[in-house]
Amino acid sequence: EEFIAPPLDPYKEALEGINELQRQQQKLDPKPFVFKLSEILRIYVQNRFNMPAMELTGEEFIIESVSNPFFQNYEDLLREFVDRGDRVKYSKETADTNETNLLLDSALHFVKDSHSRITDQESTDSQNQKTHSE
């Protein structure tokens, strides 16, 4: 009898990933840190919004996200996250902890905020369905 773990909630998975990364922040170089953070954010978007986020370039990721009305509030945040992240990942300069903290905060804010908006939306939807069915 093989035990198959239920798929993790994308939100919990993202939060756990970010918390885990926060714990390793001192040990990791900025580049691998940002690669991992970016991956967590994209996996969250991919699983939560059925968007092939892992296969997209930074620019495609922005265009794709922003085409979804839900993401329009986050355009600046995501664009900045991708731009800063790419600078850390691909430039020769070494990012300082300030920079990685900013990226971490942005990712965390995006995950928490989008999650609470979805949850609000879902509870509004289910209340609307109740009202209609009576």
Q: Would you name each region that the model predicts?
A:
Residues P32-R84:
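Short, charged amphipathic alpha-helical segments flanked by flexible coils
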Residues P10, G17, I40, F81-R84, ...:
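Amphipathic, well-ordered alpha-helical segments in soluble domains
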Residues I4, L8, K27-F35, M51-E55, ...:
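Conserved phosphate/pyrophosphate-binding and hydrolysis machinery centered on Walker-type P-loop NTPases
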Residues E1-D29, R117-E134:
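Hydrophobic, helix-length membrane anchors
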Residues F71-E134:
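Cytosol-/stroma-facing membrane-proximal "stalk/adaptor" domains immediately downstream
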Residues Q22-Q25, V66, K89:
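A structural signal for long alpha-helical coiled-coils and helix-turn connectors
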